[in-house]
């Protein structure tokens, strides 16, 4: 850390965190705009929009920003938007499969930026379909193991376990409930994700997000050096404005994850 004060280091970290937060907000706003464009601006009749708004609120996106995004997406005002979804495919170190989902108003810019982010960091672009066939589209409802509810003037912390979720969602026929550490992921057919989400809500349980995602058929284990290389690719992709989601089949062992955390 030669030549850097503690304040300068802290300031740099805060700037990096603020930049990531800004990019997260931009992605969440895009989700809202696209959902409103495809299904209308009324969340009560557009479950995809409802869930996009819920996810944005969970990430503390201001209500005014959400309202403006709904209006833009539904064609109100001069700044109405029109994005297209494009999926790119790549391989990282150790053969890790990577799916890159873009929401863009400029296809040429998106593909150029993605290609640079992948190839300059040691990855290779893949032919269409060669990577996507290794994944399945699934509905995913994420539920935190602890959540807060308002009880009168007090805030009460509640806990939820796998048995409660299984009982709450059984009629919605989820395929699996996966323990992901601080959250449970309730996996379903994409067509059932709204039913699962409503079942969770109907049981009085809070949820973090409900969306269609890509889940790998198998995972690829990596060691420390390959994990470092992969993170460089993923970080470069996450920095791109057109990239909305990145999915991979990487399996990072706990000891490798701990070593990476120490390096940050």
Curated annotation (Swiss-Prot):
Family matches, as InterPro entries: Integrase-like_N (IPR017856), TACO1_YebC-like_2nd/3rd_dom (IPR048300), TACO1_YebC_N (IPR049083), Transcrip_reg_TACO1-like (IPR002876), Transcrip_reg_TACO1-like_dom3 (IPR026564), YebC-like (IPR029072)
Transmembrane segments: none
Gene3D superfamilies xrefs: 1.10.10.200, 3.30.70.980
NCBIfam families assigned: PRK00110.1, PRK12378.1, YebC/PmpR family DNA-binding transcriptional regulator
Listed PANTHER family: TRANSCRIPTIONAL REGULATORY PROTEIN YEBC-RELATED, TRANSLATIONAL ACTIVATOR OF CYTOCHROME C OXIDASE 1
Any one GO biological process: regulation of DNA-templated transcription
GO cellular component: cytosol
Chief location: cytoplasm
Subcellular location field: Cytoplasm
Family affiliation: Belongs to the TACO1 family.
Molecular functions (GO terms): DNA binding
Protein name: Probable transcriptional regulatory protein PPA1157
